[in-house]
Amino acid sequence: PARIKSGTRSEVATCTVDYFPTILDLVGIEMPDDRPLDGISLVPLFEGSLESRPSPLGFHIRGQAAWHDGDWKAYCSKVNSHEWELYNLKDDPHEKKNRAADKLLKLEVMVEAWEKWKASVEASDKGGDY
């Protein structure tokens, strides 16, 4: 709390995967290079020097999936259906206009990145990182 200015607000997307790297940073512990971390330290965000997330966020729970990268979010309510939606969160924060049809290449790149992320998470869950 002594390092965070009262009333600080941010539009940077964060997630629970950021907790561990943030705690490590706050207590001054460095992770070995051979141990991947999915999240980022939020300390620069608290200190006002982080204006955008340096890496995308992936989600996969109960058959739903999302990939958040910068202003864009790809979302699929049923992963097995492969019916992804695409939103520009800066222009459309309430996700009313699905841009999948007119930004197909952008959507394909994001879905491919999500698939690689998911494979990495599954490998890690089986002990692949350790």
Question: How would you describe each model-predicted region?
Answer:
Residues 89, 104-107:
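C-terminal structured subdomain/cap of oxidoreductase catalytic cores
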Residues 109-130:
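Charge-dense polyanion-binding interfaces
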Residues 79, 99-101:
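Residue-level structural signal for beta-strand termini and adjacent loop
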Residues 67, 107-110:
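Hydrophobic packing residues in well-ordered alpha-helices of helical domains and bundles
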Residues 25, 48, 102, 112-116:
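Residues within well-ordered alpha-helical secondary structure of globular protein domains
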Residues 3-8, 12-89, 94, 120-126:
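C-terminal cap/loop subdomain of S1 sulfatases and analogous C-terminal strand-loop tails that border
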